[in-house]
C-alpha cells in the first residue's frame, strides 16, 4: 500500500471546468498528519508509517496515548493510522504530511464509514423488486422464497435479508482529484466519498483490483 493521508469530509459542492461543465466534487480537509512512528521489518516484522490526525485536548486521551505521542513531540491527536510502505527510509518521525502529497488528476481510493440507515428492508438494502401492487396482492414488499423445504430444512448463511444498512467501513475506488489547495489543506475529489460531513476518511493512491 502506498502512503496516504487522513482527513475530514467537509461536504459536497460543484466547480466548473474550462468548458463550463459542472463537476460534482467532495471537499476533504486532508491533514496535517504528523508521523508518530516508523515501523521496520527488523523491529516490527513489517514496514509502515503511523500518522496522527485530529487535534484534541490532552484530557481526552489516556496516559498511554499521550506518552506515545510525546515520543514524537506530537500534540494530542484523536486518530492514529498506519500505511504500509516499503519506502520508510524516505520518512522521518515528526514529519508532517499535508494535502500537497497529492496532485490534480491523480486517481485515489477513499475509505470511510458509510452513512448509517438503520434497519432496512429488502428493497432498500438489496434492491429487490416489489411484489404485485394490485388491490388483492398480499406480497408488496415481502422477501419471497428464502430457500427450499424439508431439504435442507434451513436458510443458508449469507442469504440476503433485511437488516442493518450502512455504518460500515467502505472504500470508493478510482476517484479523481480535481483540485488541491495546499494553503488550506483542501482536496477536491470528483464524486461522492463515504460518510456524512465531518466523517473521518483515508485517502490513498488508487490500488487497481482485478482487470484494468
Swiss-Prot record:
Residues 128-156 are annotated as: Disordered. This is Large ribosomal subunit protein uL3. The keyword RNA-binding applies. GO terms for biological process: translation. It comes from the Bacteria. Part of the 50S ribosomal subunit. Forms a cluster with proteins L14 and L19. GO terms for molecular function: rRNA binding; structural constituent of ribosome. Keywords: Ribonucleoprotein, Ribosomal protein, RNA-binding, rRNA-binding. The keyword Zinc does not apply. HAMAP family: Ribosomal_uL3_B. Belongs to the universal ribosomal protein uL3 family. GO terms for cellular component: cytosolic large ribosomal subunit. One of the primary rRNA binding proteins, it binds directly near the 3'-end of the 23S rRNA, where it nucleates assembly of the 50S subunit.
